[in-house]
Curated annotation (Swiss-Prot):
Signal sequence coordinates: 1-35
Main location: plastid
Organism, scientific name: Tetradesmus obliquus
Binding site for heme: Y36, C56, C59, H60
Entry protein name: Cytochrome f
Gene behind the chain: petA
Pfam families membership: Apocytochr_F_C, Apocytochr_F_N
Record bears the keyword Lipoprotein: no
InterPro entries per UniProt: Cyt-f_TM, Cyt_f, Cyt_f_lg_dom, Cyt_f_lg_dom_sf, Rudment_hybrid_motif
CC annotations in GO: chloroplast thylakoid membrane
GO biological process: photosynthesis
Cofactor needs: heme
């Protein structure tokens, strides 16, 4: 299994992601707000904000459900699997960067507790490797190995992913204790509605910026983009450019108000996040618990035997 390392150089990061997508057969790399964790990597030192929201939600505005499954407790220095699920209707198609329709991609970020990290290939059992498949997980940054990202990858194939994780050992890592820890997961399907610079993609609704009457609706490029000219009360002409993708729902001669939709909302995807907890279990506690249970069981057996012995003595005295 080959795991990527994050490059500080933006071009190097894009080449890395592009190479891995080609290996997966993802050839439709339009410069659109896909499920790109690299956008978060380039713009945010930490993908989880102080209010608990994962930054992917800044570009993927619709909320959709996600699922995260991990063991309730794990032992130190143990490989376990986290299963993430990004469900969606796989019959629907999204608007691509060129305005045409295509299948949805998915992406995810998994924020593990400090000390937890992606399991080395030589520690992953063969059965788990088969579940992981050809997915390549990479750390969010060189100093954040506990944060893993992947995507964009084909949603039809990877709406469910298995991540092999290595738990830390407090005996060798003094920054880790036997405690209960939170795990944060964010997953999205489909393209985003906003780019990191705040500009809109063609996968969102476009609204009027003024009050006025629509005087003209005309195409402005070969891809299918449309210009909507709005005449205001003071005689100004405001041109709203709609890229190929969203469908215009207004007509010439119609009066519109500020923030009134000029198009439908073509977005069929969305982002969701899930928080769970996992316990790093102390083996000595388990051993102590087993000894306690064994002691209780032994005491119960002795009580039963003592009771039977007492009953026999009573019966003998009565017969005498």
């Amino acid at each position: 299994m080959n795991f990527f390392t994050h490059k500080k150089n933006n071009f190097g990061s894009f080449v890395t992601i592009f190479s891995f997508l080609v290996a997966l057969g993802v050839t439709n790399l339009t410069p659109a707000a896909e499920a790109y964790p690299i956008f978060a990597q380039q713009n945010y030192e930490n993908p989880r904000e102080a209010n608990g929201r994962i930054v992917c939600a800044n570009c993927h505005l619709a909320q959709k459900p996600v699922e995260l499954e991990v063991p309730q407790a794990v032992l130190p220095d143990t490989v376990f699997e986290a299963v993430v699920k990004i469900p969606y209707d796989q019959q629907v198609q999204q608007v691509l960067g060129n305005g045409k329709k295509g299948d949805l991609n998915v992406g995810m970020v998994l924020i593990l507790p400090d000390g937890f990290e992606l399991a080395p290939a030589d520690r992953v059992p063969e059965e788990m490797k088969k579940k992981v498949g050809k997915l390549f997980y990479q750390p969010y940054s060189p100093d954040k190995k506990n944060i893993l990202v992947v995507g964009p990858v084909p949603g039809k194939k990877y709406s469910e992913m298995v991540i092999p994780i290595l738990s830390p050992d407090p005996a060798t890592n003094k920054n880790v204790s036997f405690l209960k820890y939170p795990i944060y997961f964010g997953g999205n399907r489909g393209r985003g509605q906003v780019y990191p610079d705040g500009s809109k993609s063609n996968n969102t609704v476009y609204n009027s910026s003024v009050t006025g009457k629509i005087s003209n609706i005309a195409p402005f490029d070969k891809k299918g983009g449309v210009e909507i000219t709005i005449e205001t009360a003071n005689g100004d002409s405001i041109v709203e450019k709609i890229p190929a993708g969203p469908q215009v729902i207004v007509t010439q001669g119609q009066t519109v108000q500020p923030d009134q939709p000029l198009t439908n909302n073509p977005n069929v995807g969305g982002f969701g996040q899930k928080d769970v907890e996992i316990v790093l279990q102390n083996p000595a506690r388990i051993q102590g618990l087993l000894v306690f249970f064994a002691t209780v069981l032994f005491a119960q057996v002795l009580l039963v035997l003592k009771k039977k012995q007492f009953e026999k003595v009573q019966l003998a005295e009565m017969n005498f």
